[in-house]
């Protein structure tokens, strides 16, 4: 009898583009695709925690669309404009879980250690600091003080932390990072800074894919969310992103290669 292949699900960062991840996962659920491991960066960490706790995406969609997400934004003073902890606490209240070992599916979350210029990986202990660190975009969210180090958004080290799923056989990536950013001769200083970060992120993704494509079966679900802001709070637009995620997942999973890999 053939050994069942282990499936890893890797969820990228991307701010409010995470609504498209919810849509894509709804399709995975309909195909009864259950990951053995979930890896999340930034918003992917939040979506991943909810999925790892065993919640269905239809219920998550209802909870989010019925919540005033703007009230979770807590202005602050210091090395960031917003405290991200309220967002993490909302996620934990929703899933009624506070520690990694209480989750139903193994979860790994990444963050960036600014103090030591390296990646931090969370898979044990309390979820709150891990989630808060992973979503803390520098300059917008206050960094998390963890063991006297400052931690920020995991996407600044690796927005698609594919390497954290290398012990899996099949890796499904849901990428909503939207690295299609372009600058023009009229672009300002902030645009140029953003493009520099995007170029670095693209290079890291390319190197990761090259390193794993020969040893793993990889499926990529990449909803086109380029026309949506990473800070999209309009409900109608959030619903549109969920639909985009569903449509792209159906397209990818309907492909002959994907069906063969997943045994559909």
Protein language model features and the residues they cover:
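Patatin-like phospholipase
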Residues: 1-41, 49-264
């Amino acid at each position: 009898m053939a050994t069942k292949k282990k499936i890893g699900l890797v969820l990228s960062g991307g701010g409010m583009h995470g609504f498209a991840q919810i849509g894509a996962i709804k399709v995975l659920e309909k195909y009864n695709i259950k990951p053995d491991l979930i890896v999340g960066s930034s918003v992917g960490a939040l979506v991943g925690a909810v999925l790892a706790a065993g919640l269905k995406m239809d219920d998550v969609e209802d909870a989010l669309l019925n919540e005033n997400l703007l009230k979770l934004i807590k202005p602050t003073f210091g090395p960031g404009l917003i405290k991200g902890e309220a967002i993490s606490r909302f996620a934990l209240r929703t899933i009624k879980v506070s520690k990694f070992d209480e989750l139903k599916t193994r979860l790994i979350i990444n963050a960036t250690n600014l103090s030591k210029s390296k990646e931090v990986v969370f898979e044990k202990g309390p979820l709150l600091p891990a989630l808060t660190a992973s979503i803390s975009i520098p300059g917008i969210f206050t960094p998390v003080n963890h063991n006297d180090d400052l931690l920020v958004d995991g996407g600044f080290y690796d927005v698609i932390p594919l390497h954290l799923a290398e012990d899996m056989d099949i890796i499904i990536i849901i990428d909503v990072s939207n690295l299609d950013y372009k600058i023009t001769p009229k672009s300002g200083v902030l645009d140029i800074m953003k493009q520099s970060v995007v170029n670095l992120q693209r290079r890291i993704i390319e190197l990761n894919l090259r390193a794993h494509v020969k040893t793993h079966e990889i499926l990529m679900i990449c909803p086109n969310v380029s026309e949506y802001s990473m800070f999209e709070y309009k409900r109608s637009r959030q619903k549109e992103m969920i639909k985009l995620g569903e449509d792209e997942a159906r397209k990818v999973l309907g492909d002959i290669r994907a069906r063969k890999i997943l045994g559909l």
